[in-house]
Regions:
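Basic, low-complexity terminal or inter-domain segments flanking catalytic cores
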Residues: 2-3, 24, 150, 183, ...
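Short acidic, hydrophobic short linear motifs in intrinsically disordered regions
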Residues: 239-242, 250-264, 291-300, 464-476, ...
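Structured, non-catalytic alpha/beta "coupling" segments that mediate domain-domain communication
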Residues: 14-38, 168-218, 382-437
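C-terminal or mid-to-C-terminal helical accessory/interaction module adjacent to the motor/catalytic core
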Residues: 115-194, 245
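Metal- or metallocofactor-binding catalytic centers and their adjacent structured scaffolds
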Residues: 215-253, 448
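Core structural elements
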Residues: 138-149, 166, 196, 247-259, ...
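Intrinsically disordered, low-complexity regulatory segments
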Residues: 1-139, 148, 211, 222, ...
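Conserved short loop/turn motifs at secondary-structure junctions
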Residues: 1, 81-82, 158-162, 244-253, ...
């Protein structure tokens, strides 16, 4: 009896084939075989939004082969990924191959190993049409918004632009943050920090001014700070109280898609799309010495914190065997999954805890190793005992010369801790954790006299909210309910590739084009860029999945309002064209002599002649650097890739093909005199192949205004 098993990717097919016998033919659909054709709307609005699917261009031969294999097989099993998208792919395959939808031909497994695959194959289910409907509803919604709204935005701002149901909200978040930064007015404040030594130790410790006998004091000006310093002239310092305690720090839960993307961004510098690509490779698996062919992690698109009891027991056994029983948490932790989570899968975890990162390293690329290490350590730490710290808080009383023989005094506080038991931190520390070597205080008791070593008054200014990074934007999308685990990476990738947002030193900054699109949508399509409205649509899609609402009724409700808004916007904006700012340059047009201007188009900035339409001359806009090309000596210019990444190349391209991701600097190589470029890890390097000079970049010291008390 022959059986045909269809999965999405060829690599996944190769892995699964190793677990099944010769009677199984495992093949790949290579993603979707049907989709909505891009050339037209492909949705019959008048017929309850019936989608008009077509075979994906270029897959006709593959579909023919799948049909032939299905016709010759005694049984066809659909083993695509276990989520909405995977369910929809299975449904499309069943429809095209003529498989009955009431038969049990859908196979699911959350991890790829022999046990999970054979268990899934042995217990097929029917295709879940609620999951399929939820995916179709999302696809149709996105097509309606994109197909109807994009032409309007293009007509009013610039040809070739696009607007999307979720991407527009993401751009709005970035734009709103930029507006907050622009409107921010910094406020001055001061801190007063002292260094003391105690009788028991020669090593100085830090303490911060907190107030006086009247209570807490916030220092806002230099004058206020100087007044306190005057009070502290010839002061005597003593310990007024010592409070000791114990702090227990718990580990973070295992990863969800969002937290994995955030941590990979923060710790590894990976962009979300790259993280998901590597995670997919780890999920699909490889040969690991001593363990055979196996997937290394569970399914990576999840918002659940749940882990199976089997995985918990395997992890606990590994911890006890390798670290000792004291590193096991006294009772199982059950992390609470948020109410809006789909919870269709476990959290992201290693499939086999015994496959440590070091064991897997030989089978992995450097990037795979880094991400697997992060996932493995995070999961194992979540099972481990708490970190126990002994804390101490010291209050210091300062009585200056003028305050003696009165009830007046100033107060300083110092706090610190020592680690009594490292617990889970032996394996994993969150990216934001403080350094354990800091904050340790000497043995000290109430009444001890302290010796002042130095006193510094430091000027500060309140800081505006930080721009989003890719990780913090994903966190905000998750917190506000916009998007789902399967969409976070594509959202960020889309808004950067379309030049609505650019990356500047890992921060996301809106372009003039992005701001113009958001302004237009805010004025005429407030719901489309409304965070709460978009989140409610995501919630409705979840309800479709759980058979709580009908997806066709949901589409009618959305489209009726959207269509009226679109028609009103067209009427209100008839004849109106939004003109983006054009900066004049000192570059003459070689055709007519006018000074060219910088314009913003679909693919970013370019130079254009202001004499349009009489003169239609355009040319690429390049940003020159001070560096010279190490190959031919030409100028090094800044460029943008098709995906929105910044790189640097020679002005003489294509005659000279020099290109680098490393940022050029003003420094020259002491060996050959050519420009130095800044590589990862703070290394300055000469890129001349015949030179190879490298040195560590010097850190710029931060300057602060201080006042010192002798």
């Amino acid at each position: 009896m022959s059986k045909l098993v269809i999965v999405e990717s060829p690599h996944k097919a190769t892995m699964i084939k190793k677990y099944l016998g010769k009677s199984y033919d495992v093949t790949a659909s290579v993603g979707h075989i049907r989709d909505l054709p891009a050339a037209k709307l492909s949705v019959d609005i008048k017929n309850d939004f019936a989608p008009k699917y077509a075979i994906v261009k270029g897959k006709e031969k593959l579909v023919k082969e799948l049909k032939e294999k299905a016709a010759n097989a005694d049984e066809v099993l659909l083993a695509t990924d276990p989520d909405r998208e995977g369910e929809a792919i299975s449904w499309h395959l069943a429809t095209v191959l003529g498989l009955p939808l009431d038969e049990k031909n859908r196979v699911k497994f959350n991890e790829i190993n022999e046990n999970a695959v054979k268990k899934g194959i042995a217990s097929p289910e029917k295709i879940d049409m609620d999951l399929v409907d939820a995916q179709q509803a999302r696809r149709i919604l996105d097509r309606l918004v994109g197909y109807k709204l994009s032409p309007f935005v293009s007509q009013k701002i610039h040809r070739g632009l696009s607007a999307g149901r979720v991407q527009s909200v993401a751009v709005r978040l970035v734009v709103d943050r930029e507006e907050e930064i622009r409107k921010f007015v910094p406020e001055e404040y001061w801190s007063l920090d002292a260094k003391f030594t105690a009788p028991s130790s020669k090593k100085a410790f830090k303490a911060a001014f907190t107030g006086d006998e009247t209570g807490k004091i916030k220092l806002k000006t230099k004058e206020e700070t100087d007044a306190i310093l005057a009070r502290l002239q010839d002061a005597e310092y003593s310990v007024s109280s010592v409070k000791k305690g114990t702090r227990r720090r718990s580990p973070a839960p295992p990863f969800t898609t969002s937290t994995m993307q955030q941590d990979a961004s923060r710790k590894l510098g990976f962009q979300a799309k790259r993280t998901m690509k590597i995670a997919q490779e780890l999920y699909e698996g490889m040969e690991v010495e001593g363990f055979g062919a196996t997937g290394l992690i569970t399914y990576m698109r999840t918002d659940s914190l749940r882990i199976s009891e089997e995985a918990r027991q395997e992890g606990n056994a590994f911890i006890e065997a390798n670290y000792g029983k004291q590193y096991l948490h006294e009772k199982p932790r059950y992390f609470k999954t948020k109410a809006s989570a789909q919870d269709g899968h476990e959290a992201i975890r290693p499939t086999v805890p015994a496959i440590t990162p070091e064991i897997a390293k030989k089978s992995l690329t450097p990037e795979q190793f880094k991400l697997y290490s992060l996932i493995w350590k995070r999961f194992m730490a979540s099972l481990m005992s708490n970190c126990i710290q002994d804390t101490v808080k010291i209050e210091i009383k300062a009585v200056g010369e003028r305050d003696k023989n009165t009830d007046r005094y100033c107060t300083f506080n110092a706090s610190g801790y020592t680690v009594r038991f490292d617990g889970y931190t032996r394996l994993y520390e969150a990216a934001t954790d403080e350094d354990e070597d800091e904050g340790k205080l000497p043995e000290i008791k109430a009444g001890d006299a302290l010796k002042l070593k130095e006193m510094l008054g430091n000027q500060h200014f309140t800081q505006p909210p930080a721009r989003y990074t890719e990780g913090s934007l994903i966190k905000m999308l998750e917190e506000t309910g916009v998007g789902r685990p399967s969409t976070y990476a594509s959202i960020v990738s889309t808004i950067t590739s379309r030049e609505y947002v650019v990356r500047e030193q890992k921060q996301l900054k809106p372009t003039e084009l992005g701001e113009a699109v958001v302004k237009l949508l805010k004025e005429h399509f407030p719901n489309i860029v409304n965070v709460k409205f978009t989140a409610s649509m995501e919630s409705d899609l979840d309800k479709v999945e759980h058979h709580e609402i009908d997806y066709i009724a949901m589409l009618h409700t959305f489209y009726d309002g959207f269509d009226k808004t679109l028609e009103k916007a067209k009427a209100d904006m008839e004849g109106v064209k939004i003109k983006l700012k054009e900066d004049e340059t000192n570059i003459p047009c070689e055709k007519c002599g006018r000074m060219m201007v910088i314009k913003t188009g679909r693919f970013g900035k370019f130079l254009a002649c202001p004499g349009y339409p009489e003169c239609k001359n355009t040319k690429p806009y390049v940003i020159e650097t001070t560096a010279t090309c190490p190959v031919c000596g030409g100028k090094v210019i800044q460029k943008k890739s098709k995906k929105g990444y910044t790189f640097f190349g020679c002005e003489n391209y294509p005659e000279c093909n020099f290109m680098t991701w490393d940022k050029p600097t003003d420094e020259k190589c002491p060996k050959c005199g050519k420009s130095l470029f800044k590589k990862k890890g703070g290394i300055l390097a000469c890129l001349d192949e015949n030179c190879g000079f490298e040195k560590k970049a010097e850190r710029k010291k931060k300057s602060t205004k201080t006042q010192e008390e002798d």
